[in-house]
Amino acid sequence: MINKINFVKMHGLGNDFVIVHKRDLATVCNLSQLAKNMADRHTGIGCDQCIIYEEYNNVYTMIIYNIDGSNAKLCGNATRCLAKLIYLDTGKKDITIMVGKKKLLCNVEAANKISVNVGNVSFNETWMPSRDRIWAFAERYMLDLKETMCVDIGNPHLIIFSKLEPQDQKIIGQKLQAKELFVDGVNVNFAEVKDNKIYLSVWERGAGLTLACGSGACGSFAAGLKLGFVHSPSTVVFKYGNLIMQEEDGNIIMQGEATFVMRGEYYCEK
C-alpha cells in the first residue's frame, strides 16, 4: 500500500525543511521513521529537519524532527518558515506557534520580513556544566576554545566565541556531544564578532553543521549582549543571509527571511 503525503519545502537562509500538516499523516504510525526517510537527500526529499504542524483555537503547534529521527525543542528558522506558510495559506500576519511549552509570537511584516519573539533566555539551567568542566574537557581533547557561555532558549546552546575552520568546528561539535558533559547533547555555536555583527556557524545536535540556525542566532546574540561583545540591535551573519536581532524588555526578537521552494507529494510505501 502506498500513502500519498502532501508536503511543502522551505528554507531559512539555507537551513531547509520539509513541512507537513498533521491531517495528512492520519495513517502514519511511526513519525520519527517517516521524518528520517523524508529527510534523506538521496532517497527522500532532503532537508535538515522535518516539521509537522496543526492548528487548534487559532494557535499552531509544531513538532520538529531531526534527520536522525530525534526531536528538536526549538528551531527559529523553521518557525519563520511555518509563519510564512501560514500567512500564504490564510493571510494571517500575527501568528502564535507553540513548540512544546514554548510560545513563539510571529509577525509577518512582509512576505520576506518575518519577526519571531522567542521570549527570554536562561543562563542558569541544570543541564549546564560549569565553565571549569568545559575548559577541562577542551584541554583533554586539545580543543582551542576562547570565551564560552551556555544559553537555554528553549533548547540548549553552547556559544564559543572563537574563529575556527569548518573541519575544526565539526570535530569540536562532535566531541562536545559527550554524555559526560551534556547528557542530552548540545547545539554548538562558533561565533566571531566584528563591528557589532556576529559571524556564526552552528553544529546542531541531531543534524550536524547547518547553513544557518535561528535559535543559535538568538542564543549567540543573548550571550554577546551579556558579555558586552554586541549591543541591540545587532546582525547575525550566515553564508546565505543575515538575521536582525533585538532585545526588548528581556525578550529576544529575530527578524529575517523565509523562502518557499516547492509543494509536492511524497509517496510512502507501507
Curated annotation (Swiss-Prot):
Q: What class of enzyme is it?
A: isomerase
Q: Where is this site: Could be important to modulate the pK values of the two catalytic cysteine residues?
A: 157, 204
- The catalytic residues are 75 (proton donor), 213 (proton acceptor)
Can you name this protein?
Answer: Diaminopimelate epimerase
Catalytic activity annotation: (2S,6S)-2,6-diaminopimelate = meso-2,6-diaminopimelate
Q: In which pathway does it act?
A: Amino-acid biosynthesis; L-lysine biosynthesis via DAP pathway; DL-2,6-diaminopimelate from LL-2,6-diaminopimelate: step 1/1
Chief location of this protein?
cytoplasm
Q: Where in the cell is it found?
A: Cytoplasm
Q: What is its EC number?
A: 5.1.1.7
For this protein, the record's Pfam families field holds: DAP_epimerase
| HAMAP family, per the entry | DAP_epimerase
Q: Which PANTHER family match?
A: DIAMINOPIMELATE EPIMERASE, DIAMINOPIMELATE EPIMERASE, CHLOROPLASTIC
Glycoprotein recorded as keyword:
no
